């Protein structure tokens, strides 16, 4: 009888999954006639922890519960160019892993890549267009930077 330790399932490496893919939602961005008043309204009426950019939501990583992750909710000025070339009223930010390989895969699949990958202390970003003309922000986060910054979060 074959030893269970010799099965492929038993011999899989314990290394982190690096498959280029979306791992969750990183942000919800939308146009607003008055972002400041909108933030204040959501804070007052719905209890969101508000800062100058919107509200940072804090949650635990399902695969690594010791890790705190973040999602940003943010109203933008109605005339913002940040959503361009999309004409839509919103933009979704997706948390991703292995952003370089993901962009390579997207290019191979004919997806429009709007800009180059940009790197900041809190992660890497790139923007793409989906098939319906929605601009999508992809973010490979470094959540520990937000944790170190402190500040109030929506939980």
Regions found by a protein language model. Give the residues of each.
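Vicinal oxygen chelate
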Residues: 2-33, 53, 80-155
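Core segments of cupin and vicinal oxygen chelate
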Residues: 19-23, 29-74, 108, 126
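Short acidic (Asp/Glu) patches
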Residues: 77
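Solvent-exposed, flexible loop/coil residues
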Residues: 61-63, 94, 150
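Glycine-centered structural positions embedded in regular secondary structure
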Residues: 1-3, 71-72
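Short linear motifs in intrinsically disordered
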Residues: 46-49, 93-95, 115-118
């Amino acid at each position: 009888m074959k030893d269970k330790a010799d099965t492929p399932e038993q011999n899989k490496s314990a290394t982190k999954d690096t498959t280029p893919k979306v791992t969750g939602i990183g942000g919800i961005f939308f146009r607003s006639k008055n972002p400041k008043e909108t933030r204040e309204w959501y804070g007052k009426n719905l209890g969101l922890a508000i800062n100058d950019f919107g509200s940072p939501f804090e949650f635990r990583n399902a695969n690594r519960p010791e890790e705190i992750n973040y999602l940003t909710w943010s109203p933008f000025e109605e005339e913002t160019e940040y959503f361009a070339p999309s004409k839509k009223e919103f933009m979704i930010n997706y948390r991703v892993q292995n952003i370089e390989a993901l962009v390579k895969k997207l290019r191979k699949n004919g997806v429009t890549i709007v800009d180059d990958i940009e790197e900041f202390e809190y992660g890497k970003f790139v923007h793409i267009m989906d098939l319906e003309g929605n601009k999508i922000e992809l973010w490979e986060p470094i959540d520990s930077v937000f944790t170190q910054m402190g500040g109030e979060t929506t939980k």
